[in-house]
Amino acid sequence: MTKVIGVRFRQAGKIYFFAPGKYHIEEGEHVIVETARGVEYGHVVLSEREVEDDKVIQPLKAVIRPATVEDDEREAKNREKEKEAYKICLEKIAKHKLDMKLIQAEYTFDNNKVLFYFTADGRIDFRELVKDLASVFKTRIELRQIGVRDEAKIRGGIGVCGRPLCCATYMPEFVPVSIKMAKEQNLSLNPTKISGVCGRLMCCLKNEQDTYEELNSKLPNVGDIVTTFDKLKGEVSSVSVLRQRVKVIVNLDNDEKEVREYAASELRFKPKKRVDKALDKKSLKELEELEKLEKKEGKSHINDD
């Protein structure tokens, strides 16, 4: 077992482990640590604890020091400097006539590097832009191309649910999502209904997937023939996944039919087989394209791994 603390460098960012060393550090404090891109100012989100050795990437770096008042002030000044750096970079992009969208400027704590995050369709030759920026800032410059999901994570926003975006509030990593999840949850397969503000399949499709898989496994499909606890046979007309209730058109003795509602546990039926929703070709193509784009972009490009 290894003693560590967990540190984040941005809202909803990936959590990195560091050795607390001689310091006693509590959750909510700030620390100065050495990272792959230099000395950084981080927020402690996991207090001291022991984790299994295989969960720690070696060599495990130790905390340089808990953040001082001077460190806090320096970090605040860096955030102000980033606003000016953003404006300057926008001007330089326009000057060089580059087809790229600047998303964020970020200083490392020690000012050893300025990172500029951007989105673009395809590859961009920004070598001359880097030289121009280096002559202005007199420090190392890194331009990092990110995807539209990273853009949403950085900028934030409000989802169709009316709540702040999942990726910008609590998700440290993007989760793989697929059309299958929308089908499993019986959601509308209209691409505009299940796409987030980033234009990709909504990350929240993953949130309830395991629950829906378990609940759906206990239900028949619409159209299945079932036997009820009171010895009646009938055809399933609708199901309520969360309530675990099933409406059945039962056959009565006098050749009449009647719609009755039962608990899923009151029915006997064959093991469920997947019945996919019928989709028009246009919607199916759009959904498949969204799924391909999500897989292509993969993990976040904001993190320094």
Residue ranges of model-derived segments:
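Basic/aromatic-rich interaction segments and small domains that mediate binding to polyanionic partners
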Residues: 240-260
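Acidic-enriched and Gly/Ser
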Residues: 1-188
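Short, basic/aromatic beta-hairpin or loop at an interaction surface
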Residues: 1-15, 194-207, 253-255
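A generic structural signal for residues embedded in beta-strands
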Residues: 33, 227-229
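Mixed-charge, low-complexity intrinsically disordered segments
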Residues: 237-238, 272
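Conserved glycine-centered short motifs in functionally critical loops
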Residues: 157-159, 163-227, 234-237
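Short beta-strand segments
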Residues: 14-16, 40-42, 232-234, 257-260
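Intrinsically disordered, low-complexity linker and terminal regions at domain boundaries
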Residues: 259-305
